From Swiss-Prot:
InterPro entries: Met_Sox_Rdtase_MsrA_dom, Met_Sox_Rdtase_MsrA_sf
Pfam families referenced in this protein's UniProt entry, alphabetically: PMSR
Active site annotation, chain numbering: C10
Entry coiled-coil feature ranges: none
Keyword line: Oxidoreductase
Family affiliation: Belongs to the MsrA Met sulfoxide reductase family.
Classification lineage: Bacteria, Bacillati, Bacillota, Bacilli, Lactobacillales
Identification of the protein by name: Peptide methionine sulfoxide reductase MsrA
Enzyme Commission number(s): 1.8.4.11
Entry function: Has an important function as a repair enzyme for proteins that have been inactivated by oxidation. Catalyzes the reversible oxidation-reduction of methionine sulfoxide in proteins to methionine.
GO MF, one annotated term: L-methionine:thioredoxin-disulfide S-oxidoreductase activity
Catalytic activity: L-methionyl-[protein] + [thioredoxin]-disulfide + H2O = L-methionyl-(S)-S-oxide-[protein] + [thioredoxin]-dithiol; [thioredoxin]-disulfide + L-methionine + H2O = L-methionine (S)-S-oxide + [thioredoxin]-dithiol
Amino acid sequence: MERAIFAGGCFWCMVQPFEEQAGILSVRSGYTGGHVPNPSYEQVCSKTTGHTEAVEIIFDPSLISYSDLVELYWAQTDPTDAFGQFEDRGDNYRPVIYYTDERQREIAERSKQSLQASGRFDQPIVTSIEPAEPFYLAEDYHQGFYQKNPQRYAQSSAIRHQFLEEHWQ
């Protein structure tokens, strides 16, 4: 099994696309990239801990590759917005691909270069590619949020889904 960590704005919206893929064993919402051990949601939202909301994905590389996950990641984000994603603003919502080893870093860098060269976006691809740091699991009420709160999830993800349809479909 392997691990991937992606930050793409609100973690509620990043779970379902990955959970639907064959070879995914788990997708958990959490916080990473900051300087406070085991932060709470309230601390992360205060924008004082340095953390981003992210998802940790455990996957079977014999069924789905890390490269496939990176491609799916791009299609869930606006890679031209470094200051948050959609209606969620600030460093805690910035887009980041966190790599766990050199191979993941190389795959992510090549994929980013390929996306930039594709001309899909008029602006530069600004998603960061950074080494993985400790991943702290978010509170239980954040786990599987789209399943527990479908109406609130639909409302909170509407702007994202509109962008994705316009730019990735």
